[in-house]
Amino acid sequence: MKKYIFLFFAVCAFSVYANAQNRTGDCTSYTSDDRSVTFYLNDSSAIQLRLCSQSTVRIWFSPDGSFQRSNPSFAVVNEDLEDVGTVHVDEQNACYEIFTPKLRIRVNKSPFNLQIFDKYQKLLFSDYADKGHISNGQRKLEYKTLRRDEHFFGLGEKTGKLDRRGEAYKMWNSDKPCYSAVEDPLYKSIPFFMSSYRYGIFLDNTYKTEFKFGTESRDYYSFEAPGGEMIYYFIFGKDYKEIMKQYVDLTGKPIMPPKWALGFAQCRGLLTSEKLSYEIAEGYRKRGIPCDVIYQDIGWTQYLQDFEWRKGNYENPKKMLADLKDMGFKVVVSQDPVISQANKRQWEEADRLGYLVKDSTNGRSYDMPWPWGGNCGVVDFTLPAVADWWGAYQQKPIDDGIAGFWTDMGEPAWSNEEQTERLVMKHHLGMHDEIHNVYGLTWDKVVKEQFEKRNPNRRVFQMTRAAFAGLQRYTFGWTGDCGNGDDVTQGWGQMANQIPVLLSAGLGIIPFTTCDITGYCGDIEDYPAMAELYTRWIQMGAFNPLSRIHHEGNVAVEPWLFGEEAEKNAKAAIELKYRLLPYIYTYAREAHETGLPL
């Protein structure tokens, strides 16, 4: 008999537990304080609504009701967007209501169910049935009602169609060279999307979040986080532009590029020598093809990342930079966020100072395999003391005459979601599962702020591969190592894939961006066969806000290599961009002020 009684109570307990995982609790009370209202549920959870403005609401689901987070937001710089006065809650039998001049917010009590209407009482956004807010250990999930005619856009650089409905996406900065037209995740994580029902959602969580737009049911969409806090912002606007502008108010304005950055640029994977830099510069000027920027890729340094010119490749780098400047070229060099162990002096210095990310299993500096230069230490940019130390090193080539940086491999490189061994990395501000997606952002912040600190009255040029929401405050973007395929047919498809990726980047508030024109990897050396495709790459690239020709290795992709017809057409496309430059620069200023894409 005792056995059956035990089984009865065990089944009841499991039922209660299972119900707690699959149903949002009932609201039993609330408290209010200035802008915020906190609703308490009978399962010990709580949900806080904070009015950031008349049309923006921060929603915080706390399963234990503590409302504690390990770090301040990496993305949000200002959430009190306007004076909203003291929030007034109207309590009714079945619900609570909060009104602003633009929104009606309704909280149904049993179960807790959040609904947001516009001022004309049109339902914009709603929790789904009785499971709007669910927790399962550290995992937190939000389920929202999906309308038959609702469509979604955003999430930053993502492949595939612009409409996200019917698709699922992950946020985990990943190194995906030659990525396909359906690859996900990629290099940047921008957990911000917009609905055709005139609202946007920004999920302010840095872990590997997931978004499912009707893939599990045609009745709901969902977003979830495996760790951290479930904090997201509901942003209402009359159109997408207004929604994006308010997101920019939350996360900061884009930096304004120098005018030359909007011209054309030339690079290749092994453009890492004085001799080749002169040859390319002279090739452009001899043929009268406009070009403003020459890049130097990863091999320009003696070691990663000592910022010293590679001996043998550069005889007199200061003179080279001065000569190229006289020819009308700016030079941008790459930097990586690591210190090669072969770079003994700098690595030992960083290790001694505690400036490298630690291995939590042994307390030592983490031993990171790297695509170039052997194993490395990973610089911990979340540690405040690192900023000036790194800034002093990166100032060396600036003093020599370079114009800016491209911050490469900040995922960190070779990262993807299957490589869980890297999760043992411990940063100053937390374990790697929390910091991974913002690692590149913390690096870009240091690069930008140190550049401005040491070079006042100069506009920073920085272009990054890996970042998180808010990157626009520090850097420009490019879409990473896109491909050109293994043959001409694949190349056309890969080029076409870059169009929605670039458009989606703009919707994710990366207004200043480019792809690797010609595709970073893939076969393009059969120049006659590739001539037409190359021409189309250049023509498409001319309408990138930033325009950079780039390919892997020592594969030359200058316009004059693809035949007379291709050179003529490429030159015409590039000249068209320069004729449009007054308009481009005007819209660049607007993008700087508003965040809207060019």
Can you say where each PLM-predicted feature lies in the sequence?
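Bacterial Sec-dependent N-terminal signal peptides
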Residues: M1-T24
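N-terminal accessory segment at the very beginning of proteins
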Residues: N19-W260, C267-G269, S273-E282, V293, ...
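Detector for glycine-centered tight turns/loop "hinges" at secondary-structure junctions
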Residues: S44, Y120-K122, G166, T361-S365, ...
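Aromatic- and carboxylate-enriched substrate-binding clefts and catalytic-loop regions
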Residues: S73-A75, P290-A570
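Glycan-recognition and catalytic regions of carbohydrate-active enzymes
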Residues: S174, P559-L598
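Generic alpha-helical structural element
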Residues: A181, Y232-F236, Q266-S273, V379, ...
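Acidic (Asp/Glu)-rich catalytic clusters
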Residues: I255, R285-G288, S504
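C-terminal substrate/ligand-recognition segments
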Residues: C267-G269, S277-Y278, G283-K286, I549, ...
